[in-house]
Design a protein with these regions (language model features):
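Alpha/beta-hydrolase active-site loop
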Residues: 48, 81-102
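Alpha/beta-hydrolase fold nucleophile elbow
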Residues: 102-115
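Active-site glycine-rich loops that stabilize anionic/oxyanionic intermediates
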Residues: 32, 39-44, 115
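Alpha/beta-hydrolase-fold enzymes
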Residues: 120-189
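Conserved alpha/beta-hydrolase
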Residues: 55-75
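The serine-hydrolase catalytic nucleophile loop
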Residues: 42-54, 68
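Glycine-rich "HGGG/HGxG" loop immediately N-terminal to the catalytic nucleophile
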Residues: 47, 69-82
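N-terminal cap/lid segment of alpha/beta-hydrolase-fold proteins
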Residues: 1-30
């Protein structure tokens, strides 16, 4: 298996960094089916998605494991931001880039979304008909986690309190220009 680091932009002008895995005995004159692999929330392409990419390349696919916008070696500020629009667009930008490679069969491009990227991959496949196959692994519904807390841990009262805090923080940011960045995982579940 050969690995090539590649860079390409999404429609939000964010530079994405990916690793393309080519199968053994790769022949640039042939047309290959391709798989785009999305990583778990908080991970990078060299971890889980890279392992899936290696295994699927071993099975004859050209694979692309990318760092999502704001993560790893990809661009985007502030770092570690979760933007559903950008993360869904990252899959379509990956389809764009792969489909421009002369050795890719444009009618055989699929996606594997792992954990947090699973939900974004489902959304991408529903919006982009160029994605011909979809698989998710341990898919996590980020929308539900945002609305209800991890493991549905928030009560209605806690949710209303959090929304009030978010509203107040938005006013502070509008007044001062200073963003408050916090990570979404509570210290105790």
């Amino acid at each position: 298996i050969t690995v090539r680091k590649v860079f390409y932009k999404n429609r939000y002008d964010i530079m994405l960094c990916a690793e393309m895995y080519l199968p053994k005995d790769f022949n640039e004159a042939q047309h290959y089916a391709a798989l785009i692999i999305g990583h778990p929330f908080g991970a990078v392409k060299e971890q889980c998605s890279g392992l899936y990419a290696q295994e699927m390349a071993r099975r004859g696919y050209v694979t692309l494991a990318f760092d999502a916008s704001y993560q790893g070696e990809s661009g985007g500020e502030p770092r570690h931001t979760v933007s559903p629009d950008a993360l869904v667009e990252d899959f379509s930008a990956s389809v764009d880039w792969l489909g421009l490679q002369p050795f890719i069969d444009r009618n055989r491009i699929g996606v594997i979304g792992i954990c947090g990227s699973g939900g974004f991959s489902v959304c991408a496949a529903s919006l982009d008909p160029r994605i011909k196959a979809l698989a998710t692994v341990s898919m996590y519904d980020m929308g539900r986690a945002t609305r209800n807390g991890l493991g549905d841990s928030m009560t209605d009262e806690q949710r209303r309190k959090l929304l009030d805090e978010v509203a107040e923080q938005r006013w502070k940011e509008a007044e001062t220009g200073e963003a408050r960045i916090r990570f979404g995982t509570p210290e105790k579940l």
